[in-house]
């Protein structure tokens, strides 16, 4: 595996900030003129990304490719694990569904096949790019799993990559977690760790210096940076833990109240990220009918198990409350992918794709019926959306196992590639579509919320370009990390490491 110089970021635990730091390095290397590819051998996430050629990968690697200024491709995340029901996940290999497997079977039956796919993907990228930014998962010190792990030190050895270990100081105990992780590594793996980064720091770094000095003396591993917490970073999150940033959103008395229904199998929740671009929107997550109130907008996001989440909504009083609010003319509803299916008359599952139940009654707010099928659709979508007497050019992507058919009274929401996509209620207060990234389309999003603003007596807003905000966020993140991390030292260590003999 020659040509590219790799660097790998591993964490002491999940959500330590590996994805964000890796994104920063993708951007920095691209800014410095290097053709850069992100790589994560195996990703477990319900947030996915469709590549230009219709393959499904983890959302983080798609965003990292954007940061690097290159087209995302399946080799950047050759294995994607999407939890679908208790102890079972859908396995996506090189962008296409492989099948559903339980955790024990995956670990014992898929290991060698998975490793072969990972090796080939990594070789392809190493031969075509200058820099490879590799992201691990969880912790490299999971001693009960390390004999068959496919995402941390085994990948570092495969790529002959130096490793930077990331610790999250926000959670507390950062030195214990860093030292503990290092102590649990095999000696040859510990030699790969060229340094650590302490992430999400708040306060005066001078107060941290005695701890940094102690750590370096105790472990012999250098601290390569202390990265202060960076608020309001408009970059898609991957981990559902990141949804909590919406729970604390606040707004004034005139704010537009947006309630996002948070079900257990919520997927592709990055669909709601552009709402952060609307300064007068208060976005809150709702899990029970009693919490719903009377919002201006209700968003039903995607789901990895639509039927189970629909049953969850019914049991918690959400379904009946949503229907009542619509019938009373008090709320607008937008359903995305699985949320779109829920808005229809019925969801049928003749092949047991999601549950043993043959069918479940939907909310009945859109004239469609859905049948879940074994074949997954993953495509990029472009078309014209018609709403409130206006037509908007929109683009996004679709990832779904079901197909929805129109019933009497059906009106399409989008005309895409010669077909009708999505649906809308006769009064246009209920919209549904399979197309993710609906709110990423700036003109439509602005018109949608300006309609609400006018009804609430709020001045209309100008168009805010979410893609521009994302590009600025990439640059802001890169500048932030350059300021607080010894980037040049890391690059020097990468070159030195590549010259070593690790056979």
Curated annotation (Swiss-Prot):
It comes from the Bacteria. It holds the Pfam family CbiA. Residues 255-444 form the GATase cobBQ-type domain. The active site is at residues 337, 436. Pathway: Cofactor biosynthesis; adenosylcobalamin biosynthesis. InterPro entries: Class_I_gatase-like, CobQ/CobB/MinD/ParA_Nub-bd_dom, CobQ_GATase1, CobQ_N, CobQ_synth, GATase_3, P-loop_NTPase. Keywords: Cobalamin biosynthesis, Glutamine amidotransferase. One of its GO terms (biological process) is cobalamin biosynthetic process. Catalyzes amidations at positions B, D, E, and G on adenosylcobyrinic A,C-diamide. NH(2) groups are provided by glutamine, and one molecule of ATP is hydrogenolyzed for each amidation. NCBIfam families: cobQ, PRK00784.1. Belongs to the CobB/CobQ family. CobQ subfamily. This is Cobyric acid synthase. It comes from Geobacillus kaustophilus (strain HTA426). The gene is cobQ.
């Amino acid at each position: 595996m020659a040509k590219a110089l790799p660097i790998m970021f591993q964490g002491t635990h999940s959500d330590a900030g590996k994805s964000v730091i890796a994104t920063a390095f993708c951007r920095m290397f691209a800014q410095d003129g290097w053709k850069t590819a992100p790589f994560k051998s195996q990703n477990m996430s319900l947030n996915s990304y469709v590549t230009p050629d219709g393959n499904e990968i983890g959302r983080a690697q798609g965003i990292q490719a954007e940061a690097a200024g290159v087209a995302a491709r399946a080799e950047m995340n050759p294995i994607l694990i999407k939890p679908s029901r208790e102890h079972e996940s859908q396995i996506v290999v090189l962008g296409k569904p492989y099948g559903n497997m339980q955790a024990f079977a995956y670990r014992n039956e898929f290991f060698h096949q998975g490793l072969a796919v990972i090796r080939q993907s990594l070789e392809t990228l190493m031969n075509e790019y200058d820099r490879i930014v590799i992201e691990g998962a969880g912790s490299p010190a999971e001693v009960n799993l390390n004999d068959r792990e496919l995402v941390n030190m085994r990948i570092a050895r495969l790529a002959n990559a130096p490793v930077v270990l990331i610790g999250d100081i926000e959670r507390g105990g950062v030195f214990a977690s860093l030292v503990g992780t290092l102590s649990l590594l095999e000696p040859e793996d510990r030699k790969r760790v060229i340094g650590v980064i302490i992430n999400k720091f708040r306060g005066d770094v001078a107060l941290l210096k005695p701890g940094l000095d102690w750590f370096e003396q105790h472990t012999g591993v250098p601290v390569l940076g202390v990265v202060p917490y960076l608020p309001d970073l408009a970059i898609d999150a991957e981990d559902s833990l990141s949804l909590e940033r919406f729970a604390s959103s606040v707004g004034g008395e005139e704010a537009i109240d947006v309630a996002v229904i948070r079900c257990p199998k919520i997927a592709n929740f990055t669909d709601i990220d552009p709402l952060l671009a609307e300064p007068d929107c208060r976005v809150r997550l709702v899990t029970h009918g009693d919490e719903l109130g009377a919002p201006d907008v209700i968003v039903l996001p995607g789901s990895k198990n639509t039927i189970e989440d629909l049953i969850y909504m019914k049991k918690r009083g959400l379904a009946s409350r949503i229907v009542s609010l619509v019938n009373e003319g008090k709320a607008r509803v937008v359903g995305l992918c699985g949320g779109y299916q829920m808005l229809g008359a019925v969801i049928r599952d003749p092949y047991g794709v999601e549950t043993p139940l043959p069918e479940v009654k939907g909310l009945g707010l859109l004239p469609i019926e859905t049948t879940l099928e074994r074949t997954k659709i993953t495509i990029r979508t472009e078309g014209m959306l018609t709403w409130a007497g206006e037509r908007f050019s929109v683009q996004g992507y679709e990832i779904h196992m079901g197909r929805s058919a129109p019933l009497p009274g059906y009106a399409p929401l989008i005309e895409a590639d010669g077909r009708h996509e999505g649906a809308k209620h006769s009064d246009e207060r209920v919209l549904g579509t399979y197309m993710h990234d609906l709110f990423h389309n700036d003109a439509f999003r602005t018109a949608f919320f300006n309609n609400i603003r006018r009804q609430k007596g709020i001045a209309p807003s100008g168009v805010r370009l979410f893609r521009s905000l994302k590009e600025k966020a990439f640059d802001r993140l890169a500048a932030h990390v350059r300021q607080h991390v010894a980037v040049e030292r890391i690059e020097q260590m990468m070159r030195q490491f590549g010259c070593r003999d690790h056979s």
